[in-house]
Swiss-Prot record:
MF terms in GO: 2 iron, 2 sulfur cluster binding; iron ion binding; monooxygenase activity
Gene encoding the protein: gbcA
Protein residues bound to [2Fe-2S] cluster: C98, H100, C118, H121
Protein name: Glycine betaine monooxygenase oxygenase subunit
Residues that coordinate or bind Fe cation: H217, H222
């Protein structure tokens, strides 16, 4: 039986889609975006449809669902999503929507179930999404095989769970193979989330990412972070000093000896992995630069691994140190509202209060996240002004922002079915 609705109300966003494409084609790539990209709810809806519903997103970590029936849930725009560990250890992802009358199946953020049971009318699903029970009153012609949960594309690599709401998402396997290699020393199946926070920022999601993609603001805003973080992006950073390059050379020799991957690996503008030293004499992103967890990750023996930085557009950045990892994900709520989730991961056998102290582990990035929240919110308030007009980026300090917006512009035009504008290459790309 075909239950798909044939009613079409048309696309009320069509005029806004055309205007969006026109603005992207004509924008100066060395300047910030026109005001509607940060303020307009219609453009936000287009962002959700063409970016967050079509690209690969990090849903969580495999260690968060270690056993059969463990699940986690998340919200992508209007779409509730369920990620669950199957009977044979597979990771499945589904729309968290019962096929009976549409109720959410799982309402908690995390949990464990034997079967997926809708709380409304107790329709019951296997962990692989098959409908097992729908009561006894659905009629003789009811075919349970037609009413399994709607699946979502899912891939795993290096302990990360990637999902896409698209039927045909962009290619990502080359990046995932590299990520798997770079994450091997961490043995992420034997990790755990020590603590997780979510903050709400009164700013457009792109402002949150733009702020992350540069450290032009760091000296004036992030005293805690700069106790350990070197501002330079990598040795190709136009600001990089010879002393920094010498430090990188010394560190890479030690990393090679321990078979720790470190080389810069890029996959277009969407993905990047690189290991960079921390400030000389520090080994972890803590207030004193000492280990945040006494028990090191995976097979790691030397805590002095700097920070392996992982970028995944549109919404994630990561710092992987010898003793713990920090995973950041950005989730748009509205045109001027964004959630930022931060997860600190340690070895699964590390004992709270013995091997690590949660307050100490999170102290640097609690402060940094709050500082970045204020910066993004003030940026948003200014952009809302009638006086706002796009301003120029520094190719020396803000090339990461330029790269992000070039990626965003190209993906938007591509997903809107428009010809992409020429993307200029800049230092650090």
């Amino acid at each position: 039986m075909d239950v798909t609705s044939t009613l079409s109300l048309g696309d009320p966003l069509e005029p806004a889609r055309k205007a969006t494409a026109d603005m992207l084609r004509s924008r100066d790539h060395s300047f910030s975006l026109p005001q509607p990209f940060y303020c307009d709810q219609r453009l936000f809806e287009i962002d959700m449809q063409e970016i967050f519903h079509k690209e690969w997103l990090i849903a969580g970590m495999t260690c968060e669902i270690p056993a059969k029936g463990n699940f986690l849930t998340l919200q992508i725009g209007k779409n509730p999503v369920l990620v669950i560990r199957g009977a044979e250890g597979q990771v499945h992802a589904f729309h968290n929507v019962c096929r009976h009358r549409g109720s959410r199946l799982c309402v908690s953020e995390k949990g464990k179930v034997a079967k997926l049971v809708c709380p409304y009318h107790q329709w019951t699903y296997e962990l692989d999404g098959r409908l097992l029970f729908a009561g006894t009153e659905m009629g003789a012609d009811f075919d349970m095989k037609e009413y399994g949960l709607k699946p979502i594309q899912v891939k795993t690599a290096g302990g990360y769970i990637f999902i896409s709401l698209a039927e045909n998402p962009p290619a990502i396997d080359d990046f995932l193979a590299t990520l798997e290699h770079y994450m091997e020393p961490y043995d992420m199946e034997n990790a755990k989330v020590a603590v997780q926070t979510t903050i709400r920022e009164a700013a457009n999601w792109k402002l949150v990412i733009e702020n992350n993609r540069e450290c032009y603001h760091c000296n004036g805003s992030h005293p805690e972070l700069l106790k350990t973080l070197l501002e330079w992006d990598d040795v190709t950073d136009p600001r990089a000093s010879q002393a920094f390059k010498d430090q990188v050379a010394a560190c890479t020799s030690a990393w090679e000896a321990e078979k720790i991957p470190y080389a810069h690996a890029s996959f277009g503008l969407r993905n990047r992995i690189v290991r960079m030293p921390l400030l000389d004499g520090t080994v972890s992103m803590t207030m004193d630069g000492k280990q945040g967890s006494k028990k090191l990750m995976g097979r790691i023996k030397n805590p002095d691994l700097g920070s392996m930085r992982i970028l995944h557009l549109p919404h994630s950045w990561n710092h992987c140190m010898g003793d713990h990892l920090i995973v950041f994900t950005v989730w748009p709520i509205s045109a001027q509202e964004t959630l930022v989730t931060t997860k600190w991961l340690v070895h699964k056998d590390a004992v709270e209060g013995v091997d690590y102290d949660v307050a100490r582990l999170r102290e640097v990035w609690d402060a940094t996240n709050d500082q970045d929240r204020r910066l993004a919110e003030e940026n948003q308030r200014g952009i809302n002004s009638d006086a706002y007009q796009p301003g120029p980026y520094s190719k020396t300090y803000e090339f990461g922002v330029i790269n992000f917006l070039d990626w965003y512009s190209e993906r938007m035009l591509n997903n809107l079915g428009e010809e992409s504008a020429h993307v200029r290459k800049v230092a650090g790309s």
